Amino acid sequence: MNSRQAWRLFLSQGRGDRWVSRPRGHFSPALRREFFTTTTKEGYDRRPVDITPLEQRKLTFDTHALVQDLETHGFDKTQAETIVSALTALSNVSLDTIYKEMVTQAQQEITVQQLMAHLDAIRKDMVILEKSEFANLRAENEKMKIELDQVKQQLMHETSRIRADNKLDINLERSRVTDMFTDQEKQLMETTTEFTKKDTQTKSIISETSNKIDAEIASLKTLMESNKLETIRYLAASVFTCLAIALGFYRFWK
């Protein structure tokens, strides 16, 4: 490693970048083993599990060999040790950052198991909720059915009562009309009987009056006949008297 590469490491740490430049082939492949990039999703009820000990998270390499390598490339011992110390600190910081952003396969499996357990709990809760809702719906349906039956019974009772009341009213009205018709017929019969009686009485009175008139006419005729005879007699007597007087005067003058 030369001074340019070490300076790049210092600059990257100073800027706060999470990317660390390193020469190709100097870091062991064990640093990249058993790491998987994951996307952190908030909102899951999961428990963070840390199964990697702290001593296994540190970058372990032969610092003495690295110091000797730096000395062979033109650095003195103090500079080489300073660079190795800085590289060790940067490696530890980088590993801490990597462990914060990446998980191991075991951690991923545990997280997946926790998520599956959480999903199972949610599924169970959904099943329980569905059963509870179904039971509530069934109870509500039964309650509505009972209420509908009660309303149906009430409607049937009210219908029967109204029908009975209407039938009773119709029968009463029919009886009243029949009684009224009977009374009217009775009054008509009484009126007819009274009229017939009055007519009979009137006819009897008329007949009696006619008979009286006929009797009076007959008596008047008889009286007129008798008066006529009396008048004739009187006239005859008068004529004879006048003739006798005339004969007397005639004889006297003669």
UniProtKB/Swiss-Prot annotation:
<dbReference type="GO" id="GO:0005739">
    <property type="term" value="C:mitochondrion"/>
</dbReference>
<keyword id="KW-0496">Mitochondrion</keyword>
<dbReference type="InterPro" id="IPR024461">
    <property type="entry name" value="CCDC90-like"/>
</dbReference>
<comment type="subunit">
    <text>Interacts with MCU.</text>
</comment>
<keyword id="KW-0175">Coiled coil</keyword>
<dbReference type="GO" id="GO:0031966">
    <property type="term" value="C:mitochondrial membrane"/>
</dbReference>
<dbReference type="Pfam" id="PF07798">
    <property type="entry name" value="CCDC90-like"/>
</dbReference>
<keyword id="KW-0809">Transit peptide</keyword>
<protein>
    <recommendedName>
        <fullName>Coiled-coil domain-containing protein 90B, mitochondrial</fullName>
    </recommendedName>
</protein>
<comment type="similarity">
    <text>Belongs to the CCDC90 family.</text>
</comment>
<keyword id="KW-0812">Transmembrane</keyword>
<feature type="transit peptide" description="Mitochondrion">
    <location>
        <begin position="1"/>
        <end position="42"/>
    </location>
</feature>
<keyword id="KW-0472">Membrane</keyword>
<feature type="transmembrane region" description="Helical">
    <location>
        <begin position="231"/>
        <end position="253"/>
    </location>
</feature>
<keyword id="KW-1133">Transmembrane helix</keyword>
<feature type="coiled-coil region">
    <location>
        <begin position="129"/>
        <end position="164"/>
    </location>
</feature>
